[in-house]
Structure formats: structure tokens, C-alpha cells
């Protein structure tokens, strides 16, 4: 999947034809379902960028990217040689704690690339731009500062974004990396999270349940059971 110009994408007015255009530009393997509020939020973002900088059409983002197997999704990612800018889009009011939690989680997933990370959320209904500070707080953001970072002269990543985010980067062994495991610095695939939810649901109904499953080393068996150990032991 390639980065695209969100300026070009937002010139289109029809969400059906927009999905076709997005696939053509990004090389995505499937047609992305783009909802009307997403289109309107992105248009509002582009208008704000246009009022603070020139050549918005040259900006390239990975749009609505989901990490394979893990299912983690990002609205907009600009990836350069030395920095990553993440912009999340919201159409309505969202609590600052929810914004903070999402941006912190996003930053953690992105940190495997070893580049500086700038994290923003744009709430289109309020025309409000906020950022995650280095101290993990939410603060009002400056459009000029964001545009300056977006126009930084370092090269954009031109390759397939899937090549950067391999699921293996997020695997942690509780045996060889116990400190990171205890800090919960690991990630579960969507299938693993589903299994985990089923186990916790049954245990909350009746604690006298038995679960047995097998798997090869490195398949996340310990990570799946960790919340149950914490909550019920």
C-alpha cells in the first residue's frame, strides 16, 4: 500500500467513486469503505492546511492504514526518513482522555520504527487541532507548527507501508524479555484478542472453568492468559 495525496482524494464528491480512486492511488488490495463523515472531516482538514501553507497537494499520507494481523488502524500517517506524523480525524466531540489514550497507543505502535513521532487529532465539528505532548498530555496545537513539520525537507517513505510494520516486531517472549512482558509491551492479533475476550467473559460468569489449548512457541499463549491471571488469581 502506497501513500497518497489527500488533496487529490478530497476533490471527489461521491463516496462510491472515492473508494475506486483511493484504491487506484494507494494500490490497496480491496475497496475501502469511506463514510461521509470521514470525507467531510478530511475535507475540513485540507481546508485548514490550505489556509496555513502552499502546495497542500504535494503532501502524501498513508490513509486508513491497518497493521496486518494486529488490526491496529491509523487515519493518516506521514512517514519521512526521520519522523512520523500521525493525524487522527474526529467528526464530533470526544473526551480528551479518549483522544490521549488513542494517540498514546498509536505512538507505541509507531515507536518500533525508531523515528520521532508527532501525534495530532483534528475534531472537524469544533475546528480544533490538539496534540499529544512529550509528557503524555493533550494540548491545543498550532497549525503553523504542524504545517512546518509536514513540509520538512527529509524524504517521504516511498515504499509499501506493510514492509515497515511486520507483526514479528511486536512479539515479546515472557521468558527472554520478562521486563517488557510485565510492562505489557506486547500486542495481540485480532484473533488473539477475540480468544482473550471469550475466556474473560466465561470466567466472569463462572470462575470454575477449564481452558486448554495448544500452540507453537511464539504464538502468544501466555499473553492471552495474562489478563485472566491478573484479574482472577
Label each residue range with its predicted role.
Residues 97-100, 186-193, 223:
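Conserved phosphate-coordination/catalytic loops
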Residues 210-223:
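Walker A/P-loop nucleotide-binding motif
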Residues 166, 170, 184-209:
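N-terminal pre-P-loop "Q-motif" helix
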Residues 231-233:
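Post-Walker A helix-loop "phosphate-sensing" segment adjacent to the P-loop in P-loop NTPases
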Residues 104-107, 198-199, 229:
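Short, well-ordered amphipathic alpha-helices
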Residues 224, 228:
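Hydrophobic positions on the alpha1 helix immediately C-terminal to the Walker A/P-loop
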Residues 1-167:
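Accessory nucleic-acid engagement/destabilization modules that flank
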Residues 174-182:
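Short glycine/proline-rich turn/loop motifs
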Amino acid at each position: 500500500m502506497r501513500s497518497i495525496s489527500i488533496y487529490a482524494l478530497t476533490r471527489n464528491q461521491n463516496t462510491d467513486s472515492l473508494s475506486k480512486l483511493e484504491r487506484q492511488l494507494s494500490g490497496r488490495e480491496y475497496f475501502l469503505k469511506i463514510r461521509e463523515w470521514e470525507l467531510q472531516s478530511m475535507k475540513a482538514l485540507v481546508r485548514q492546511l490550505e489556509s496555513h501553507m502552499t502546495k497542500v497537494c504535494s503532501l502524501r499520507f498513508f490513509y486508513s492504514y491497518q497493521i496486518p494481523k494486529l488490526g491496529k488502524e491509523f487515519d493518516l500517517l506521514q512517514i519521512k526518513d526521520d519522523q512520523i506524523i500521525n493525524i487522527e480525524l474526529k467528526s464530533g466531540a470526544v473526551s480528551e482522555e479518549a483522544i490521549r489514550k488513542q494517540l498514546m497507543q498509536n505512538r507505541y505502535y509507531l515507536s518500533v520504527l525508531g523515528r520521532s513521532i508527532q501525534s495530532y487529532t483534528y475534531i472537524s465539528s469544533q475546528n480544533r487541532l490538539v496534540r499529544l505532548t512529550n509528557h503524555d498530555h493533550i494540548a491545543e496545537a498550532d497549525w503553523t507548527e504542524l504545517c512546518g513539520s509536514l513540509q520538512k525537507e527529509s524524504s517521504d517513505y516511498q515504499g509499501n507501508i506493510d514492509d515497515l510494520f511486520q507483526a514479528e516486531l511486536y512479539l515479546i517472549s515472557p521468558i527472554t524479555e520478562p521486563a517488557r512482558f510485565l510492562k505489557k509491551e506486547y500486542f495481540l492479533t485480532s484473533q488473539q484478542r477475540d480468544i482473550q475476550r471469550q475466556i474473560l467473559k466465561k470466567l466472569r460468569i463462572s470462575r470454575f472453568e477449564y481452558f486448554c489449548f495448544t500452540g507453537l512457541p511464539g504464538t502468544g499463549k501466555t499473553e492471552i492468559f495474562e489478563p485472566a491471571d491478573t484479574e482472577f488469581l
